[in-house]
């Protein structure tokens, strides 16, 4: 039988009050507290590398970083996040290389049942977020559960991304929609 953690990261119904999950969340809160009090960027990066599931080199995250578990977050090389990053990682959050995240951005994988009886039972579920390389999120962007974004995507300030999009697009609005395609540069000969 699958553990509540295994159910959670698979996107199945799980019980967030499970003792194992509570212990993992508490360990994450301790790392969160240490990171958010650290003023030395190198020491902060070391905490992130220990806390998150995987990271590339050259990462910089401003304070306040808020996450559920940390171990389900995977970020690539050259990752920058401005102030107040929230990553609720009940399912994996994967972001490719060369990402720039503006202030007050949220990556949210948790979902709750719509049926009130199911919701009141304490069950939750989630869906992963996957983002390709060269992502730029303006301030206040929210990425919702189950979203996949391709490479070279720009999400304009305040965008609420509720569905998946492919490569080379600029998104804006609530719900986010494509407002511009980014031309692909031709190879130089």
Q: What does each of the following model-derived ranges do?
A:
Residues 60, 136, 154, 170-172:
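Short-chain dehydrogenase/reductase
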Residues 151-164:
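C-terminal/domain-terminus segments
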Residues 1-58, 175-189:
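Terminal amphipathic alpha-helical/low-complexity segments used for targeting or macromolecular assembly
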Residues 5-6, 51, 121, 128, ...:
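Short secondary-structure boundary/capping segments
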Residues 48-49, 64-66:
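Short, solvent-exposed loop/turn elements at beta->coil junctions and helix N-caps
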Residues 65-75, 80-149, 174-189:
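Flexible, glycine/small-residue-enriched loop-and-beta-strand segment within the central core
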Residues 165-167, 172-175:
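Acidic, glycine-centered active-site loop in nucleotide-sugar glycosyltransferases
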